[in-house]
């Protein structure tokens, strides 16, 4: 489903609550302009208010995989993610136990070329892998980082069966991410 709202197209995905935003790019001989975020647009489309409280940015090289991360309970985070430079495969996994898409994932290529963004509601694990030589990844969160509530799922969990688009020998993960549990052993 496509809805064109002012300077941005908003698409529903196969997973309820995850939406793709595609800003309109205005270019001329000076460069380009786009509206990357508009609170009322997202709130109106979702039917509830999202109040982002923290912006984060990471720089990573090709093959770096960060994820799959989430925060538990009242510290869960909704995120609006985008790529400022380069390209990534972005993945959201539905961890909402009352959801008809529990345990399913949605993936999309986000890049500085396509300008697409992904809104991920609370109750999801999130991760991405860098497909380009390097990438600058930016994300807004509606809840602060809370170390005691952080958790995750191993990237290559057989139940989730995520295609990361790169072979395992090209992936770079932190020691911490390599020690994450599998989906079936999660304690939510």
PLM region spans:
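Non-catalytic, conserved peripheral segments adjacent to functional cores
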Residues: 2-113, 132-134, 141-188
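Short beta-strand His + acidic residue motifs that chelate non-heme Fe in jelly-roll/DSBH
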Residues: 118, 126-131
């Amino acid at each position: 489903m496509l809805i064109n709202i002012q300077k941005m197209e908003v698409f529903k995905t196969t997973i309820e609550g995850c939406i793709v935003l595609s800003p309109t790019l205005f270019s001329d001989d000076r460069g380009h302009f786009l509206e990357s975020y508009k609170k009322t647009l997202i709130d109106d489309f979702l039917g509830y208010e999202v109040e982002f409280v923290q912006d984060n940015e990471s720089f990573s090289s090709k093959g770096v995989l960060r994820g799959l991360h989430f925060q538990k309970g009242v510290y869960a985070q909704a995120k609006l993610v985008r790529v400022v430079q380069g390209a990534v495969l972005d993945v959201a996994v539905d961890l909402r136990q009352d959801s008809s898409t529990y345990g399913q994932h949605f993936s999309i290529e986000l890049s500085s070329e396509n300008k697409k963004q992904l809104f991920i509601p609370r109750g999801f694990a999130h991760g991405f892998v860098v497909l380009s030589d390097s990438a600058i990844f930016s994300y807004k969160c509606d809840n602060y980082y809370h170390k005691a509530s952080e958790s995750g799922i191993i990237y290559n969990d057989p139940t989730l069966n995520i295609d990361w688009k790169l072979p395992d020998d090209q992936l770079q993960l932190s020691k911490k991410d390599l020690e994450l549990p599998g989906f079936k052993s999660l304690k939510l």
